[in-house]
Amino acid sequence: MSKIKNYIPKSCVLAGVDILTVITENKQNAGNLGKSSIANGVIQLQSLDYGIEISNTQMQNTYFHELVHQMLSSIGELELSENEKFVQNMRNMIFEFLRTADWIRLEEFKHNKFSDADSNAPFIKEGIAEIK
């Protein structure tokens, strides 16, 4: 399945709230590439930073950074949401996972299209991880 390269969600639902992604050109707020409001249901991304167009990767990074803020705020973790180091680390983990995940249709997986019988991959048996 395809990866998320050059994509961001135009909308989503988070904790029952519809979230819309919008692009702005706020030249007075240069250096701040995005902001979000769970109350308003918006993730706002800048198209320019000090007059220079934001790259696709920067825009994706900013989107997921703001999404982590919204996730934390929606579950009442306001202190963590204000911790930029924590937010950035969570963004790194989520974005890396989404960017590199190799997706398979669940029906293919269920029908043993990728069986562990042909590999040395770890598998789970009765709740205990075993390695062949």
Describe each region flagged by the PLM.
Residues 61-73:
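Active-site recognition of the HExxH zinc-binding catalytic motif
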Residues 1-57, 74-132:
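Metalloprotease/metallohydrolase-associated module, dominated by Zn2+-dependent proteases
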